[in-house]
Structures are given as C-alpha cells and as structure tokens.
C-alpha cells in the first residue's frame, strides 16, 4: 500500500493556520507531525526505522559550527595561518531533516509557498564528455541520444511547477545552467531549455541567464542557439591554461586551443564571458600560476573566478595523489599565497572584486547568481542532483539520472531530501552574503533584524582584528586580504 493512501494530512488547513501575514510558512510543526507519523507507519510499511539515506542526513543535520571554529590564529601572515584546512565547499548549520518517506508531501507544500525575496533558478545538466579528476559533481557520461531524452524530461519537470505559487509572478533575477557540462547538450536542446525558461517563468527584464560549460565541443551552432534563445552569460571552466596541468586533470584542450576558443566566443560580443581558474592543482607552481594570470589579463573576457581546490576524501584526484600517480598538490600556505597573488594581480590590472572569488573586467559581468546562492534568496531547482531553497527550506532532487527520469515519467516531483533551517536562518544567510562580498554592514542588521550584531559578536570581532582579518570602519567592518 502506498503512503499516499495511508496518510491523510490536512495540508490546506495547515497552510492557512501557519502562514504569516507576510506569506511565510512555519514548517517546524509539520516536520514534527511527519516524524510522529513516520514512527507509527514505518513498521506497517516494512520500512526500516533507520534508512541509510536518513542516517546520512541526520549526521549532516547534527553538524555544528562551534565558537572555536571562528577563532583565528594570530600570526604575521593571517591569510596563511589564521584558519585550518578547508574540508568542504559548502557550509553546514543546524537543520531539521524531513524524513525521506514524507518528502513528496513536503515538496508539494513547498512548491505552493510564495517566493518573498530576490530569486534564482538552478538547472543541473548531469552529463560530461570526460570526467575531471578533481570533480565530485560528475553524474553521468554524455551520449548524444541522451540529450533529447534529458531535455524532454527537464521541460516536463519545469511544467510541473509552472502554475504553483512558488513560480507565481515575482521576478526571477538569475538563471544558472550548471552541472555537469550543459554545453555537452545538442544545440537544439540548449535552445529548447533556455526558451522554455523564458516562456514558463517570470524572468526579470535584466535577468542574468548563465550557461556553464567547456570550450571543447562548444561549437558555433551551440553558441548561436544559446544566444538566440536568450542566454546572456557564459561561464567556462578553464581551471588552468597550462597544458600539462590540464591533461593531468583530464581536460582535453591545450593552452593554445583555449585562447583561440575564448577569443572566438568573445568576438560574438553578445554575452558576458567568464572563466574559472582553480588554484592548488597538482603540478601548479608560482611560474605557471603567474602565466595563467597574465593570460587572463590579456584576453577580451568580462570576468574571472578564482576557486581553491578542495581535495575531497575519496575523489579520483585524492586517490591518484595517494597512489603516487599525480604530483602533490600545493599546501594550504602555498594556496593562500596563490590566492593573494591572484587577488592583487587582478586589482592591479583594473578588475573589480565583485566578491571574495569573483572579479569583473567589464561592467557586463554582474555575478548575480553566485551572490544570490550565498544569500537568503529563493531558488527553484530542476534536474537530477539540483538543489533549491524556498523561504529557507532547502531541498535536493534525486541525484541518479535514471531514478530522476523515472520520477518525472511518473509525473512526480523529484525531490529526495529536504531540510528546515533554524529560527534565525535569514540573519545567518544575510551575514554570509555580506562576508562573501567582503564587508559587514552593522547598521543593516540593526534596521532589518533589530539586533546589535556588532555588540553580539564583539569577542569574535576583537579576536579577528588582533589576527589582522578585520578592519573596523564604524558602521562597517571590512575583511582584509
């Protein structure tokens, strides 16, 4: 017997009862009810009380950031010594986990909650022509016949949300097609996806529409299909221009291929062109990192992102390094110096620091999606493994491509996991957003949240100032390099 036949939960009554005048929904009571019902129903359904996925999510939810984690080591080189090794590309916080059997019901509720903030859409394309050794986002190898199959399913998934309150009429400020490698898709399918977004969703007049990809296989017909359909930003994962470093990582194009390809893409003069560089790759050194930066400054691109390599445990790259088949990666201190050099070089060459990782060369680059992703912004998410958030309630779609296809074929939303944040989540998100931008506006928090954050954090502020991480500028605090 299916859960839908057993559970009769008064969703409409709940929504009316627990929706505030501003349209925000309190999910805490609903989650508690789900947990009570779960304990009662799981034995009848033959479901183990502790499923592997649920256990994993519980461990994630219990991860706490203690005050000690924020205390910096005082030294003459704060950028190198202030903190320990970074172990994750995402922050964690205290959350309530929606038990997996009840996620389908919770996502139906969430899809009918109005967006109340600036908003984004994230589309995950699960394919790559090759797997890069440093990447943990790889899902599936690309096969030409999968392009139409995936696109048909994606459009069907987007149409499931089309008339929900979460789509509504509030403007969407940024759309990001990531992955994976979106540019692996066929030209006509790239066109269909972008065009469908413009047709189904209330995109703002100045909506930033990004297509992420690689220059390999990003042919003229694909470029022109994206532009014609309404994309206005391309984000290309260069990672390094050094051919030897690239080949070790599983990248196909040589330095010369990349330079020619970027110059050609920029010659269209119809969209912002941004590239990613990674610092800390095995085999990188002062010489080839400096050469990468010089090439960036010479190209007619609109911006560049500098990302630190996080060598995650169990990644193909970590295994290769451990086996001695790959050079050792630069140390934490070496990576810190590489970042500092990159930051200073870009500013000296008149790039604008849009955030701690993103730099604009022209005013075409706005970096909207990346800032929204760190903020309290609502995000609709489509595709296998895509993650979204509405009013602080975050969700992630099933990661397996085949299982995602099955869900969509059955006419069901594909969410697999959901998390309900703690009470002050919006304050924490706004603080995280400002730190990402390189400053903290104390006055903003006083006006918006009625809290003297500067006083509440005075011990941490004092400690960070001693460590050389923070400059007190009255109503602002600026982060140092």
Residue ranges, per PLM feature:
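Accessory beta->alpha helical hairpin/"wing" motif in late/C-terminal subdomains of nucleic-acid enzymes
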Residues: 475-481
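Local cysteine-cluster metal-coordination motifs and their immediate loop/turn environment
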Residues: 124-137
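C-terminal scaffold of the Radical SAM
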Residues: 111, 118, 140-164, 170-451
